[in-house]
């Protein structure tokens, strides 16, 4: 792992391997593309782009006149995204937050991609069962190890991101921080709050992945050859599941599949971006996404894919879901769940989790952003920023 990307990238060609040179070129390319977006973005106060000693690419917005939110606040992007996902909110947020940070997670965007080091353990196998109409039979074969062993194994993968977020906080010499995480970044942010409760002031989970309870949750015990009733509508139930699974080949290879398809993959990706980001007016951001998804500057590195495929099932349900762990959060930490009005993520799961926390006297709230989908900060940046600042400033 190199400690300073600019210094590392300044090595002569003889001093780097071919693989290193490709990674370096990718980092430089993504940083250049990010700079193009930032050059067209209005912010309040100063903006500074640096690589931390821990290898995190960060954008720091400092506005000494902002007085609504004085606690340093970090924005953590979702899967196959980067710090630029929040670019449409930078103006409004930097107007109200004294110190705002947007970072690229490790092995994402222009951040370094350190090796993923985990103890050699047999890969966790998905629960195998058989559907009988609306019921399910849990078979005897391949019984799972104890839940504690699985959880310990999963935590090794979570720590790849969680521990580096904590190191990022220390590198910036910050005390308590507000953490705002979207989708996969919301799941990681939640796990960060569990592991480092003293580092968190407030936690905002934006359309987080991995909230739902399910038959796949590692804490559930099942009797072999026993029939259980399934539910496809109650994401708080241990009997919950989803019918659709991502094909295994696509799940395990993800964006690489598009790259392997050549021009056809690029065309499919371009069509997807045009449809999914129809509310985003700036072509420069859409071009950035295309480069990130299928270009030589692909934002998602193998480490991220490996972590993702260990933490989640092929139906995108978490093996250690948020709803089953909220009781372990510091009850004094305010938490807000935020979704888009037309979000494809399971809003009901977030609502039920909020209700559960409130019943247990925790500080929780639930908000929906109108006229917005899963990327609510891109679809309705003004309302998103207003809701976030309102939560953080209370």
UniProtKB/Swiss-Prot annotation:
Locus of motif HXXXXD motif: 374-379
The reaction(s) this protein catalyses: a 1-acyl-sn-glycero-3-phosphate + an acyl-CoA = a 1,2-diacyl-sn-glycero-3-phosphate + CoA
Keywords for this protein: Acyltransferase, Lipid biosynthesis, Lipid metabolism, Phospholipid biosynthesis, Phospholipid metabolism, Stress response, Transferase
Domain spans labelled AB hydrolase-1: 74-381
Highest rank taxon of the organism: Eukaryota
Keyword Lipid biosynthesis: yes
Additional observations: The isooctane tolerance of organic-solvent tolerant strain KK-21 may result from the alteration of the expression of several genes including ICT1, due to the loss of their proper regulation.
Family: Belongs to the peptidase S33 family. ABHD4/ABHD5 subfamily.
Entry's free-text remark on domains: The HXXXXD motif is essential for acyltransferase activity and may constitute the binding site for the phosphate moiety of the glycerol-3-phosphate.
Protein's name in the database: 1-acylglycerol-3-phosphate O-acyltransferase ICT1
Originating organism: Saccharomyces cerevisiae (strain ATCC 204508 / S288c)
């Amino acid at each position: 792992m190199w400690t300073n990307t600019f210094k590392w990238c300044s090595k002569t060609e003889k001093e780097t391997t071919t693989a290193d040179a490709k990674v370096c070129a990718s980092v430089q390319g993504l940083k250049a593309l990010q700079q193009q977006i930032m050059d067209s973005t209005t912010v309040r106060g100063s903006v500074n782009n640096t690589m931390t000693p821990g290898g995190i690419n960060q954008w720091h917005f400092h506005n000494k006149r902002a007085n609504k939110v004085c606690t340093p606040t970090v924005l953590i992007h979702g899967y196959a995204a980067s710090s630029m996902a929040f670019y449409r909110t930078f103006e409004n947020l930097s107007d109200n937050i004294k110190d705002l940070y947007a970072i690229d997670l490790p092995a994402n965007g222009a951040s370094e991609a350190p090796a993923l080091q985990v103890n050699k353990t047999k890969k966790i196998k998905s629960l195998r069962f058989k559907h009988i109409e609306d019921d399910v039979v849990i078979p005897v074969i391949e019984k799972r190890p104890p839940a504690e062993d699985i959880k310990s194994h999963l935590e090794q993968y979570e720590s790849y991101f969680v521990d580096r977020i904590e190191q990022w906080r220390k590198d910036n010499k910050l005390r308590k921080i507000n953490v705002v995480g979207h989708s996969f970044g919301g799941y990681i942010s939640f796990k960060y709050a569990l592991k480092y409760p003293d580092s968190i002031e407030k936690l905002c989970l934006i359309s987080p992945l991995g909230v739902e309870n399910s038959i796949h949750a590692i804490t559930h015990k099942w009797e072999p050859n026993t029939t259980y009733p399934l539910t496809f509508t109650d994401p708080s139930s241990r009997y919950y599941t989803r019918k659709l699974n991502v094909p295994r080949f696509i799940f395990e290879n993800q964006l690489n599949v598009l790259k392997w398809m050549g021009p056809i993959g690029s065309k499919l990706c371009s069509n997807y971006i045009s449809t999914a980001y129809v509310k985003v007016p700036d072509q420069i951001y859409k071009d950035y996404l295309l480069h990130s998804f299928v270009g030589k500057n692909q934002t998602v590195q193998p480490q991220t894919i490996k972590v993702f495929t260990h933490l989640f099932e092929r139906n995108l349900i978490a093996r250690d879901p948020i709803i089953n762990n909220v009781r372990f959060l510091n009850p004094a930490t305010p938490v807000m769940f935020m979704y888009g009005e037309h979000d494809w993520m399971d809003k009901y799961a977030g609502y039920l989790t909020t209700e559960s926390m409130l019943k247990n006297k925790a500080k929780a709230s639930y908000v929906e952003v109108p006229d917005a989908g899963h990327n609510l900060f891109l679809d309705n940046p003004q309302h998103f920023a207003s809701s976030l600042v309102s939560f953080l400033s209370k």
